[in-house]
From Swiss-Prot:
GO function terms (MF aspect): anthranilate phosphoribosyltransferase activity; magnesium ion binding
Residues engaged in binding Mg(2+) 2: D227, E228
Organism of provenance: Pseudomonas fluorescens (strain ATCC BAA-477 / NRRL B-23932 / Pf-5)
Binding site for anthranilate 2: R168
Gene3D superfamilies: Nucleoside phosphorylase/phosphoribosyltransferase catalytic domain, Transferase, Pyrimidine Nucleoside Phosphorylase, Chain C
Binding site for anthranilate 1: G82, N113
Binding residue positions for Mg(2+) 1: S94, E228
Protein name: Anthranilate phosphoribosyltransferase
Top enzyme class: transferase
Amino acid sequence: MDIKTALSRIVGHLDLSTEEMRSVMREIMTGQCTDAQIGAFMMAMRMKSESIDEIVGAVSAMRELADRVELKTLDGVVDVVGTGGDGANIFNVSTASSFVVAAAGCTVAKHGNRAVSGKSGSADLLEAAGIYLNLTPVQVARCIDNVGIGFMFAQSHHGAMKYAAGPRRDLGLRTLFNMLGPLTNPAGVKHQVVGVFTQALCRPLAEVLQRLGSKHVLVVHSQDGLDEFSLAAPTYVAELKNDQITEYWVQPEDLGMKSQSLFGLVVESPAASLELIRDALGRRKTEHGQKAAEMIVLNAGAALYAADHASSLKEGVALAHDALHTGLAREKLEELGAFTAVFKQENEG
């Protein structure tokens, strides 16, 4: 199906099949559509509302065209990722959590990009930390094998997305493409914590990942609007495990933590986010650093559970707490920087 036919269908509020959507996305991502067609398609899809079949088709096309990272095994390899767009501007919780997960002995294949709407995306933060981002897929795999964590910069692995970049920027609205990043990890991980910008997406994205073969995934949105677990409010979870989806609310107290406000966790830049994270992963000299550490532990615990490294969310949080207090997470951050510096020299001379 071509994009013109698809548009006439969508404008009539008719859904596309998975295969039809895959075909249209291939057209878009191989440069066969005009900016006007892509913009109209994104807007029409948003107004109609995307079906599960359509999201599965879009994700399938994007995965096919990605520069994949081949790992020795995907057993227990996890990604902690969010759609962004929650407007909260708090520090990079999922990225910081990833280093605690690695410190706990669990392998992390982190996928991320620059900020969507916030002040600091995962790529912005890691760049500020001196981590080289423009790695080849083989180099990312070597990071994961040697350090226990590697970062896949979305722009490097999803080059075909460049064709939609202009229309996305010009529209300035959330579209289907905002959902695709967390669902298109180039290593093909089967274990994830996926934060989303609205609770309404939790169940649908869990169903999409179920259709695409994921093993254990938590799709989450907190009552106070975050695309991650919150210390300040209950968090809604759609959990895919054993090919079944269950939905529930989680309070910090359920996991052995204390509810508290997010005051002091908002950042204005990647450098400010990095400073807070280094304090949280280090000696926690400030009150805000201590609070950030607890937010990190909460989300790292969820990732350890999703990776089947822990048998429950509560056990995952306890393991994450222990891992953070060893100081090893801070060491992992520095180690990844040193490891990627070698690749920078190889790639840039």
